[in-house]
Amino acid sequence: MIRPAPWVGAGHRGRGGEAGACTESLGSESGDVGCDAAEIDQFFPPAPAAGGPDDAGAEPCIPDLAAAAAAGKRRRGGFPPPMPRASGPLFLRAERRGGRLILTEVRADERERRVVFRAERDGGRLRLRFANDGDGPEAAGGGGGAGGGGGELCQVAAGRRGVQVGAVMMGAI
């Protein structure tokens, strides 16, 4: 028999020691729930042993595997929908205003979108450099070889109109 539990506010300890007595301290760092075994047994009496007098004539409980699998799928849910990519002429521009990150959708010219970066291999490393439409990799980054640093890339970004740089990572890939 299932007894309906009285509605109790969070952390409420009533006269009769309702369920709020056991849930009062949930979430504490120590894990102490603030009740003892006697309080738990009061609300949730132990189940009778299998094969006792109540089991005479009872049908055995066989779990329904299909129902259990369906319930598991409902609990897990599916993957969230995929995030939209900047595959078209739209992209997001990030800027900070008053300590908040503001993302603004911007429509870009198709030709400009394709030439933001140029990739090259240099000494076993992949380098991304800002590119102008007619420039080669040397002119876009301000020099070749392994001497270019992150500051050099940021200076190029500051000279470009409409390019936002959040971080420049230099290192072996």
From Swiss-Prot:
Function: Involved in starch metabolism in endosperm. Acts as a modifier of SUGARY1 (SU1), an isoamylase starch-debranching enzyme involved in amylopectin biosynthesis in endosperm.
Protein name: Protein SUGARY ENHANCER 1
Tree of life domain: Eukaryota
Family matches, as InterPro entries: FAF, FAF_dom
Alphabetized PANTHER family for the sequence: FANTASTIC FOUR-LIKE PROTEIN (DUF3049) (PTHR33155), PROTEIN SUGARY ENHANCER 1 (PTHR33155:SF7)
Family listed: Belongs to the fantastic four family.
One GO-annotated biological process of the protein: regulation of starch metabolic process
Span of the signal peptide: none
Region Disordered, annotated ranges: 1-31
